[in-house]
Every structure is written in structure tokens, then in C-alpha cells.
Amino acid sequence: MLSRVAKLNSRLVSLALLGSQIAFGAITYQHPDDLPSGVDYDFIVAGGGTAGLVVASRLSENSKWNVLVIEAGPSNKDTPETRIPGLADNLPGTRTDWNYTTIPQDALGGRSLNYSRAKVLGGCSTHNGMVYTRGPRDDWNYWAEITDNQALKWDNVLPIMKNTEKFSQDFLDQSMEGHIDPSVHGFDGMLSVVASYTNVSFNNLLLETTRELSDEFPFKLDLNDGKPHGLAWTQYTIDQGAERSSSATSYLESTGDNVHVLVNTHVTRIVSAGNETDFRSVEFAVDANSPKKVLTAKKELILSAGVIASPQILMNSGIGGREELQAIGVDTLIDNPSVGRNLSDQASTLLMFDTTLPNTDYDVAAALTEWDNSRSGPMAYAARLNHLTWVRLPDDKLSGSDPSSGHDSPHIEFQFRQISHQLPPADVPNQVQLPDPDSIGVVLQFSVVNLYSISLGSVTLNNNDPFADPIIDLNMFGDQKDIAILREGVRSARRMFSSQAFKNVVHETVYPPAGVTSDEDLDAFLRTSAVSYLHGVGTLSMSPHSASWGVVNPDFRVKGTTGLRVVDASVIPRAPAGHTQIPVYTFAEHASALIADSYN
């Protein structure tokens, strides 16, 4: 797939003009030496990802405050391929990716997994599949309870989510009627959202299934009403111009020139600014061979480097478990063993069914030309199939206690991908043994996801080199209940495609083979096929002020420090039953208001 991306480079050169025509209010600098002298920054945001740019944008609304954002990756203006919805699956493994790999996973037979994380301005909102899900109300109420932060309750965050959303009721002349519930959406916010869909016969057959098997797969008018159970039209962060809407294109582009953005620059450490607990200074460099520089924020430093890099930066700064830091030669300034622990993610597997349905393939070069000329065609869509299904398993299929946050929360997600002879590029690492393409015909392909993994992983350090990749251990299937739930998800999917609606057009599974039906055989298949769904959170988890666990307090301040907060996916205590993009936006909006209010 990378070779295909290389072939597209010549087409993307013509699209580079798109970036040069966009005027940021913020001022972007390509190198630390380019930063203006004599500017004192009130706030420094270490990491220009989804959350970091929300925080920078909101703080800059006070025109008296100067804000600096430091981002390791390039500007999204310099990566025009990230703006095209139809290229989303091509981005992992490219220049906008950290290209992490996990350590071998014991329960997966020693397989290591690719762990894609965005390395570009806008972070994962510039690099992800653009799916817009808020998660169940149960998750938000659970987070509020375990963190002792009532501001996170569903009834309190729903207005935030609606206020930040700019939902479009039509897209490329497609009406949204019957695809969403307008009452649960906002229409005047920063982040553009649509419910775009392709007109394929598969859609109608899915809807027939919701009538035939309504108990397991009811039709859900809107997956973002707080009770996502059933089959619904997918919503995406795409704007009316058929381009990706990210924190870079929505929030950052609305700021004034009191925001400075330094790209292609690596944050190496957080540094004490004068006493043992005041961490308002940040150390950074272009690469390992470049000189390091230090800047100090007048008010606060906000760490927003993501679920992997944020704990890595804290540990390199001396904030972490004492024994672990001493072992790699880092002086311990704040002893907190919770740093880097509690990595909560979702396990998924690809399923393929032999089918006679029309395929969803298209000519990529022609589609790029169409998008370039008219912002229409296949590249205007984030996916070739446009439904999500959320399944709640019955109690007798849970192998013990219910891991979900409540009765309105699903355990399983189906994300439909494509109908094709080609295999999908993004979520199938090289370590997974897929069928030989020559041995299969046209196949329906989709992901089955265990939304509530009990197993927790970690991010630790190999050494004290801030430019070295950290050790990522997902501990996938460390708890047997996780593989049991995913196994039931596979069986649920087979029931869906054994329905009368699909009887004559969808046939036996080819991955896993049709004969793989017993618990033992399905588990063996999952151990060789499961991958991360790349929704990791929790490595710097929020917890109550008085808690003996966790890394940040409900006000996002790092425990035991002053002048330092963390705002990104790492503070979310547990992965939601959904995609993480919108919870990250919402946490960032909440944090921004707290920070601003503390100085007004």
C-alpha cells in the first residue's frame, strides 16, 4: 500500500497549492531558530495534536495572552494528502505517523503489532478515519464517578459537544433526513460533521436486517444520542468542501496571531522552572544531533503529546515510578508509579465473507482528479461503506461480570470497510496471516471490535534517550474475558450475515474459514488475527485529588506539581465504547475553560 501512496505523490504535488492558499491566523515556524526573540509566552502547549490545538485556540481568545505550540511533525498545510477523506486508510506508515511497534504480545503467540500514532499538526484528528462518535452516556457518567469530576457527566458534557459541532444537514446534495436526529446535534460550532454515505445496495440489505433481527441489530437513528445500540449511519468530521475537518483546520485556522506554532520540533523534557515542583519550562530540539533549547511559560505549560508521547516525556523529565526511572539513569523528581500505566485500548479483528454483492472498488487516480476538480466522487468520502453497528451481548455471553459502563453501552462494534478483491491497507499489519488474494473472490470486509477490554497495558522507557521509541505493551488478551467477548462478536457478525436479507448475496466466511466455529478454534484464530483498534487512552489517567492512583487531578494538573497540566487522550481513564476523537475534543474544551477561568 505504501507503493500506491508513492505513485500518488505526483498527483498530490498539484494539491499542495491547497495548503499554500490557506491563511492561518496563527504564525507557523519551521525551525526553533525562526522563533521571534523577545516574546514571552503565557502558555506553552507541548504537542499540536487534537487536544493541543483546541487548548491553544481557546486560550488565544484572550488577545492579551501569547500561546506557543510545539509539534514534532510537519504542518498539515505541508501534507495535503491528509485533507482528502478518501486517503485516510493510506496514512498509517507514512511521514505523518510515528510508526510505533508494540513489544511481542504473549497472548498473541509473540506477535508484535503496528501502533500507528499521528505525527502531524492536528494529531490524530488529521490522521484518523474521521468517525464522529461521542460514546455512551454511561461512559461519561462512569468517568465522572471514578475521577470525582462531576463536570464529566453526560448531562454536563453534552452541551459542550453540541456547542463545538457544526453539523451539516446535507452533503454533496445528499439529504441527512432519516440518517440523524437533528435534536442531538449542534450547528454553529468549530468542528464540521456530516453523515455522508455512498449509494450501494449493501445499505438497503443492512436496513432489512434491522427489521428481521431487531433484538440484536435494531435500527438506530442517531448513534450520538448517548445510547448507541444498533445499526446507524456513520457520522464523519468532514466539511462542506469535502475535506477533512481537524483541530488544525477548524480550531487553529480561526486563531489570531497571538498563537505561534513551531513544527518539526521534538519536545524532549519538561524542566523545573525554579523549584522542585514548578514545571513551566520545556526543552526541545529538532533531532538528536541538534542543540536543545528551553523556554518557560509565564503561566502554565500544557502537555498534549498523546497517549504514548506524553508519559514518555514525563518519565524522561523525572516524573514517574522511582525504581523504573533509576534503572535507566533518570533522576526522580516526582515519584508516581502510575505514569505510563493503565494503557486502555480495544482489540479488533478483520472478518471477510464471500459475496456476490457489487464491489466498491474505483480507479484511485481518476477519483483524485475528480476530487481535485470538483470536491466530489469517491475521494470525498471517508469510507466505501457507511454504517456502524453496536451490539450489546446478553449476560450469558459475557463470561463473568459485565465490563461495560452500563446497560445502555454496547460491547461490540462492527465497522464495515469495503466489498473488494483487494485487502484493506490500514488495520492489517504485516504480522497477520491473511488469505492469499488469489484464493478468494470479491469479499465483504469489516472490523469486529471488543470495545471494553479488561486487559491494561503500559508505556515504559528503553533508556533515557528522548528520541528513542518507548516500550509499548498492550497486554492484549491478558485477561481471557477479552478474547471471549471478541469471540462472541464474531458469532454475532455471522448471525447478521446469515439473515434472510443476505441469504442470496453473502455466503460463507473466508476469514476465518467457515469451519472455524468452536470456542477453541475461534480463540486460536483471534490470537493470530487480532490487532489494536488504535484507541489507546489512560496512560496519565485522571483521578480524584486524594487518590493514591492516577497522574492528573480533575483540574488536569499533574499531581505534585505546579504550572503543569496534561490535556490529551492519556488522561481519559478508560477507552470509551466508541472512537476516541470526540471524547478528546470534549476533554480539551473542558480543560481550556478551566485553565482560562483560573486566570480571569
UniProtKB/Swiss-Prot annotation:
It catalyses: pyranose + acceptor = pyranos-2-ulose + reduced acceptor; pyranose + acceptor = pyranos-3-ulose + reduced acceptor; pyranose + acceptor = pyranos-2,3-diulose + reduced acceptor; a pyranoside + acceptor = a pyranosid-3-ulose + reduced acceptor. Residues 1-25 form the signal peptide. Its EC number is 1.1.99.29. The active site is at residues 535, 579. One of its GO terms (cellular component) is extracellular region. N-glycosylated. Belongs to the GMC oxidoreductase family. This is Pyranose dehydrogenase 2. It comes from Leucoagaricus meleagris. The lineage of its organism: Eukaryota, Fungi, Dikarya, Basidiomycota, Agaricomycotina. The gene is pdh2.
